[in-house]
Amino acid sequence: MTEQKQVKKPSARRRARECTVQALYSWAVSGNTAEQVELAFVLDQDMDGVDKPYFRKLFRQTIENIETVDFSISPYIDRAFDELDPIETAILRLAVYELRFELDVPYKVVINEAIEVAKVFGADESHKYINGVLDKIAPALGRK
C-alpha cells in the first residue's frame, strides 16, 4: 500500500498574501497605477480560495502607506532598496505593513507567513533573508 502525502491547501489569508505580493511586485515593476494593477490582477489571476476583501485591503493599504513602510524597512536592510530583489521588496513591504498596521495579527504569524510566501516566490535563500530582516524590524515596531 502506498502512502500519498496530502498536500494542505493554503488558507484564504495565505492566498490573499501571496496575491498581494504578486500585485505589489507588478505595481513596482510596471509603473502602472495601483488601480490598474488591482483590476488587471483580479481579472487575470486565479482568485479561487483567496480572501478577496483581505487581498484588497492589504494591497491598497500597503501602497497607501508605502512611504511609512519603506521608511520602517530601510534601516534594517543591508543594501539600497533598488538593489533588493523586487519579490523580496514586495514581501518585506507586505509584512511590515501588517506588523505596523494590522495589530490584530500576531507578529509571529506575520513573520511566518512572509517566510512561507518567500519560499514560494523568492530565490532559494530569500526566506532566510526575509526572516532576518523581519526579526529586527518587529521589536523596533514594538511587536516582540
From Swiss-Prot:
One GO process term, biological-process aspect: transcription antitermination
UniProt keyword Transcription, yes or no: yes
Pfam families: NusB
Sorted UniProt keywords: RNA-binding, Transcription, Transcription antitermination, Transcription regulation
InterPro entries: NusB-like_sf (IPR035926), NusB_fam (IPR011605), NusB_RsmB_TIM44 (IPR006027)
Record GO terms (molecular function): RNA binding
GO cellular component: cytosol
HAMAP family from the UniProt entry: NusB
Family in the record: Belongs to the NusB family.
Summary of the function given for this chain in its UniProt record: Involved in transcription antitermination. Required for transcription of ribosomal RNA (rRNA) genes. Binds specifically to the boxA antiterminator sequence of the ribosomal RNA (rrn) operons.
Protein name: Transcription antitermination protein NusB
Organism whose genome encodes this protein: Haemophilus influenzae (strain ATCC 51907 / DSM 11121 / KW20 / Rd)
Gene: nusB
